[in-house]
């Protein structure tokens, strides 16, 4: 059953100095670990790059972890992703730079978003990362999102 979330309250209180679509502050070590997992999944599993492919993977129930860059301009390009991830119960994390996200995804240009579909050799690390993300979410008054089960 899909959860309905009011976008006005969903985007009401971003952390200071962050774009409106950022729901919680992600520590640098967590963001770096997410980029590392994306890189490992690219080599040993399956990922998708870009906002459109990320959106499709979440909607189709394929996503295990969504990475969203914090420096996207215009921010409306990725603003729907946190809300979609909440509705579909997919873990998501913010990374500081779209350049770093593109590099971790294995492309020579920046990427606004990317998604891990199959973690490959990073499966154990992915579960540990989602636990850390849920700890950060709890500090901001958000509910935990479990790692999606295998299909």
Swiss-Prot record:
<dbReference type="InterPro" id="IPR018492">
    <property type="entry name" value="Ribosomal_eL8/Nhp2"/>
</dbReference>
<comment type="similarity">
    <text>Belongs to the eukaryotic ribosomal protein eL8 family.</text>
</comment>
<dbReference type="GO" id="GO:0004526">
    <property type="term" value="F:ribonuclease P activity"/>
</dbReference>
<keyword id="KW-0687">Ribonucleoprotein</keyword>
<keyword id="KW-0689">Ribosomal protein</keyword>
<comment type="subunit">
    <text>Part of the 50S ribosomal subunit. Probably part of the RNase P complex.</text>
</comment>
<dbReference type="GO" id="GO:0006412">
    <property type="term" value="P:translation"/>
</dbReference>
<dbReference type="GO" id="GO:0005737">
    <property type="term" value="C:cytoplasm"/>
</dbReference>
<keyword id="KW-0694">RNA-binding</keyword>
<keyword id="KW-0819">tRNA processing</keyword>
<dbReference type="GO" id="GO:1990904">
    <property type="term" value="C:ribonucleoprotein complex"/>
</dbReference>
<dbReference type="GO" id="GO:0003735">
    <property type="term" value="F:structural constituent of ribosome"/>
</dbReference>
<keyword id="KW-0699">rRNA-binding</keyword>
<dbReference type="Pfam" id="PF01248">
    <property type="entry name" value="Ribosomal_L7Ae"/>
</dbReference>
<dbReference type="GO" id="GO:0005840">
    <property type="term" value="C:ribosome"/>
</dbReference>
<dbReference type="InterPro" id="IPR004037">
    <property type="entry name" value="Ribosomal_eL8-like_CS"/>
</dbReference>
<dbReference type="GO" id="GO:0001682">
    <property type="term" value="P:tRNA 5'-leader removal"/>
</dbReference>
<dbReference type="InterPro" id="IPR029064">
    <property type="entry name" value="Ribosomal_eL30-like_sf"/>
</dbReference>
<dbReference type="InterPro" id="IPR022481">
    <property type="entry name" value="Ribosomal_eL8_arc"/>
</dbReference>
<dbReference type="InterPro" id="IPR004038">
    <property type="entry name" value="Ribosomal_eL8/eL30/eS12/Gad45"/>
</dbReference>
<dbReference type="GO" id="GO:0042254">
    <property type="term" value="P:ribosome biogenesis"/>
</dbReference>
<protein>
    <recommendedName>
        <fullName>Large ribosomal subunit protein eL8</fullName>
    </recommendedName>
</protein>
<dbReference type="InterPro" id="IPR050257">
    <property type="entry name" value="eL8/uL1-like"/>
</dbReference>
<comment type="function">
    <text>Multifunctional RNA-binding protein that recognizes the K-turn motif in ribosomal RNA, the RNA component of RNase P, box H/ACA, box C/D and box C'/D' sRNAs.</text>
</comment>
<keyword id="KW-0963">Cytoplasm</keyword>
<dbReference type="GO" id="GO:0019843">
    <property type="term" value="F:rRNA binding"/>
</dbReference>
């Amino acid at each position: 059953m899909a959860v309905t979330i009011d976008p006005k309250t969903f985007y009401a209180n971003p952390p200071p100095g962050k774009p409106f679509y950022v729901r919680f502050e992600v520590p640098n070590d967590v963001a770096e670990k997410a980029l590392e997992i994306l890189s490992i999944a690219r080599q040993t599993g399956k990922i998708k790059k870009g906002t459109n492919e990320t959106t499709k993977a979440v909607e189709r129930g394929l996503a295990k972890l969504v990475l969203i860059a914090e420096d996207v301009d215009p921010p409306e390009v990725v603003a729907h992703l946190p809300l979609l991830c909440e509705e579909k119960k997919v873990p998501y994390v913010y990374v500081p730079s779209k350049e770093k996200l593109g590099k971790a995804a294995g492309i020579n240009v920046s990427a606004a978003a990317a998604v891990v579909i199959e973690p490959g050799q990073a499966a154990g690390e992915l579960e540990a990362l989602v636990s850390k993300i849920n700890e950060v979410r709890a500090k901001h008054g958000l509910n935990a999102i479990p790692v999606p089960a295998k299909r």
